[in-house]
Amino acid sequence: MKNKVFFLLHGLFLCFLFLIPFQGIEAQRKRKNIKVETKEVSLDAFKFRNVGPAFLSGRIADIVTHPDNDNVWYVAVGSGGVWKTENAGTTWSPIFDDQSTYSTGCITLDPSNPSTVWVGSGENVGGRHVAYGDGIFKSTDDGKSWKNMGLKNSEHISEIIVHPTNSDVVWVAAQGPLWSKGGERGLFKTLNGGITWKQVLGNKEWTGVTDIMLDPRDPNVIYAATWDRHRTVAALMGGGPGTAIYRSDNGGDSWNILSVGLPNNPDSNNDGIVNNDDSPIINMGKIGLAISPQQPDVIYAAIELERTQGGVYRSSNRGESWTKMSNTVSGGTGPHYYQELYASPHEFDRLYLMNVRVLTSGDGGKTFNQLPERDKHSDNHAIVFKDDDPNYIMLGTDAGIYESFDNAKTWRYIKNLPLTQFYKVAVNNAEPFYHIFGGTQDNGSAGGPSATDEREGIANKHWYKTLFADGHQSATDPVYNNIVYAETQQGGLHRIDLTTGEQVSIQPQASF
């Protein structure tokens, strides 16, 4: 009897095992026939919150002050929109956050109606970290609201000038795309306040306009500098046969090239290697222009040549002929990143050349000295003067805004303008609140908590610098939360111990 029961149970068990695969197959068939309901979740469900830091500022592209109230400033930021202050930097408001681009290259106010603000989006420098823009923007209510006025394919806009007495006439210098040919390049003009645009200079696929200026005596006289520019991942082609200086005497309807005394650009009907007289072609790079407010027949040009060489040139006859004054040229990462030239409104032949450190000349460009910059960040891009104060200078740098009231002897730093451009971020596994780390453009690397248990939340005091120079990518140790890795430019790699503050270079070295 026991054996019968045993064999019966054993047989039932084998049947059960035999049926299991078929049950699985049947279950799979049923699952295939079931329609799974899916829901689309909008990204609007995820709300961003500001975690800082606010103790670092960032790269300034352009600054303009209100002509009737010099406490009102508008600031175009390379990677942070447009900001406005009405109390000389005590407090700030971001006024461009709802627009289609965060990169801005230039800003100007209508001289006839300063409530009208024009912004050119897309910063006009040649670095790999530069974002492209979305054309021209216009505000008629002091920056409260904006309207896109076209030129969306320009990507990088270098200058906007509004006619001094006719608000409908505006000129826009568009450098054009950095990484590709074509787009909207050259000098564009509108006669109807930006409703329509006409290209009046430049028609080459690589040639844009990098600087323009008007004769203060006659707005029909316009000077423009064109620039051949193209970047790849590996290299920057920062010059070419299309680079030149032009003048128009009829508001941009026709142009004359101004080349007498300048480096020898190609003339017509040549083979691209030598000119017709067998002299070698010397291609020019980025050009910065300035006009003397005291004697507007005097024009200055800072010209980049091949292999980061160059010079400053001066004309006393509206550009008909030029004299080389010196070999001075912007340095650092190259003139493509600087090269803006300014003439002082207070002193004839006083020039300021934007550079790693500002270079200034009091003799029309013959000699240059470094502007005193004690306790001030380097890498300068924009300058502002006051008509009624010869000792006042405001500078826009890679680390924000500085102003001097004593002709650069001392500097006031505008600390409360949070504009830092982060390349990449990383997080550690710290508890109860993980920390965030990132490398920034020219403001080192930094870290800070994702939250705190303090009533005030995250404040500047909770953030800290981890490394110096140009940061890029940070990384964290998955086990030891106080170990962080950070980078500097040109391949520098460091290990940082947050407990001791020790920084050790661990950049791999070549073996010989």
Which ranges hold each PLM region?
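Bacterial N-terminal signal peptides that target proteins for export
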Residues: 1-12
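Boundary at the C-terminal end of the N-terminal hydrophobic targeting segment
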Residues: 21, 26-27
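Beta-propeller blade termini and top-face loops
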Residues: 27-512
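Bacterial N-terminal signal peptides
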Residues: 10-21
